[in-house]
Amino acid sequence: MSNYGVKELTWENGQLTVHGLGDEVEPTTSNNPIWTQSLNGCETLESVVHQAALQQPSKFQLQSPNGPNHNYESKDGSCSRKRGYPQEMDRWFAVQEESHRVGHSVTASASGTNMSWASFESGRSLKTARTGDRDYFRSGSETQDTEGDEQETRGEAGRSNGRRGRAAAIHNESERRRRDRINQRMRTLQKLLPTASKADKVSILDDVIEHLKQLQAQVQFMSLRANLPQQMMIPQLPPPQSVLSIQHQQQQQQQQQQQQQQQQQFQMSLLATMARMGMGGGGNGYGGLVPPPPPPPMMVPPMGNRDCTNGSSATLSDPYSAFFAQTMNMDLYNKMAAAIYRQQSDQTTKVNIGMPSSSSNHEKRD
């Protein structure tokens, strides 16, 4: 802080003088003017403030991006802009008003360099903004972004055009192949029907189309039928009485046919036995020596399935069916078996009786 309680700045003989109340110390101003050169008419506020700032013995130089600038000139190189203070009083009031401010900031327009400080006693700080370069870089980045967006837009447009072109080419190729197939079929039809007119060909095509529609409908019906469950397609309803009666008749017919076949087999076996025994014509006398075959066991016809619906069994045509179609029961079978056994026993006894007499005759001859 300053040693003066109150201070003021005055402009005297081209120099800035400080006046104050209280204990005085050596003035910080020198008797010699700070600027050896004349102001050359540059009596602006910036010039006055520069004089106040340069009262310290140490001097500093401001550096700009383009090089050192010792004269603290503006961008134009001279103090060409004048504030227009022709009178000394106006300058004094301006300096006094500026001195009462706590912080002073001076912007040097040369090369975009800023200089700011809080008070006369505080240290100076330099800060280079380079607003021009920043604006340049900003504008350059914006330009690059814009160019990149334009390039992306052009690339997307080119890709979309390429896709459209490929799709159109594929469509044209498929259409060409379809026309070729149609033409080939028409040529084949022309070869098959060389004298047919266009109306005949159209009618043939109409018939083919109708046939294809019918086939398609049948295929759809079959697919639907296959997808439906079996119970929904054919509901299990109880069979009517007529169906039951027909099934019963068919089962009875099957049983009768089986019985007839069994009787025929039994009669054939009896005839074969009688033929071996010599009863069916002139047989040898030793036929009774051969034991008769055992009678076939009684065959019980299997019961037919009542649930079966297919009762139409094809019967074999037998020429002896009229002869053997006779009723036979167990009583007749037993009687025939007893008669055959009696005949066999009689023949065996006769043979046994005749054999000793023949042996005695041989002895007598001897």
From Swiss-Prot:
Region (Disordered): 59-84, 131-181, 235-261, 344-366
Compositional bias (Low complexity): 247-261
Induction: By red light. Stable upon light exposure.
One GO BP annotation of this record: regulation of DNA-templated transcription
Tissue-level expression: Mainly expressed in leaves and seedlings, and, to a lower extent, in stems, fruits, flowers and roots.
bHLH domain sequence ranges: 166-215
Result after altering E8A: Loss of binding to phyB
Written domain comment of the UniProt record: The active phytochrome binding (APB) motif (3-17) is involved in interaction with PHYB.
Compartments (UniProt record): Nucleus
Keywords annotated in UniProt: DNA-binding, Nucleus, Phytochrome signaling pathway, Transcription, Transcription regulation
Gene Ontology molecular-function annotations: DNA-binding transcription factor activity; double-stranded DNA binding; protein dimerization activity
Record protein name field: Transcription factor PIF7
Gene Ontology cellular-component annotations: nuclear speck
Taxonomic source organism: Arabidopsis thaliana
Record function comment: Transcription factor acting negatively in the phytochrome B signaling pathway under prolonged red light. Regulates PHYB abundance at the post-transcriptional level, possibly via the ubiquitin-proteasome pathway. May regulate the expression of a subset of genes by binding to the G-box motif.
